[in-house]
Amino acid sequence: MQVGVSVRVRRIIAAGAVAIAGLGGAVGVIAADGLGSSPDTSSIQDVTAAPPPQLPRGGRSILPEFRVYAHYGAPQAKQLGILGIGTPTAAAARLTRQARAFSGKGRRPVLPAMELIGVIANAGPGADGKYRTRQTRQVIRRYLRAARAAKSLLILDIQPGRADFLTEAKAFEEFLIEPEVGLALDPEWRMGPNQVPGRVIGSVDAAEINAVTAWLSDFVNAGNLPDKLVIVHQFTDGMIRRKKGLRQRTGIDMVLNADGFGTAAAKTATYGRVVRGRGPFHTGFKLFFVEDTGLMTPSEVMRLRPRPEVVIYE
């Protein structure tokens, strides 16, 4: 199963147009200089006097205690996914309502999540030549407030263009301090020095993913934070190079997520390849409301083996 070039180009064009023109007063122009300077994190050092922070629905571990149900997208264009349709508050209400399809007797409790594209790959190089645009702090804060009110996670998805995942992850320090905020890494949009998003399918070496999880694990431990979800999207075998070298980290619940759209049979086959030999890592499965041919029902998704621990809809 392979993502169609026309769809990838359409999404790149939609995101790129917003990077140039913005969304007026509702969202604003995406800042070329990113999220600003790193925050003062001294307040997270003294954790002895207060109880440790908890996850939105209690506890400090996400997987395997919960099944995560997520909606993906960004407010810049509806082509980027369902999460960006309507206000963040409306998106949170829709997420909570649709998550109920995955709950039931004998199943894990469901923890909803908003997967916001925090770094959007662009068809143009931008001022720094990195072919990506970071969301403004204003946009991220709006989704964080909505996620918090709905007792949901906020996952910041990174489409890095020609930048690297660690640099982009560190730009989100001020949000990762929050107990409900995690990361998603999208190797499809990790470009080499001469590659352009939308023209080729990207890839990443396991060492780069390991660098992100090592940094984030230290961050979690320093702040006595609950576990962080880190989702790694994949739909081709070559998207994660030297995949067997991926490392497990304290405080990190890493998910290997089967991405890509198509028929149920093709998606099931992709899922099998992605999770085969997964070792200590968790399982994820992504669906597309528009691009999938015959959208799988929640019952069909739950019949996959192993059962996905994270289910994402775009």
Language model regions located:
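Glycine-rich tight-turn/loop motif centered on a GG-T
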Residues: 84-85, 125-133, 197-206
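Substrate-binding cleft of extracellular glycoside hydrolase catalytic domains
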Residues: 101-102, 109-189
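C-terminal region of N-terminal signal peptides and the immediate post-cleavage residues
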Residues: 24-45
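Active-site-proximal loop/turn and secondary-structure-junction residues that shape catalytic pockets
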Residues: 75-77, 118-120, 160-162, 187-191, ...
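Structural preference for beta-strand elements that scaffold enzyme active sites
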Residues: 66-70, 109-115, 151-155, 180-184, ...
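N-terminal export and membrane-targeting signals
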Residues: 1-19
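N-terminal module-boundary/linker segments of secreted carbohydrate-active enzymes
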Residues: 38-89
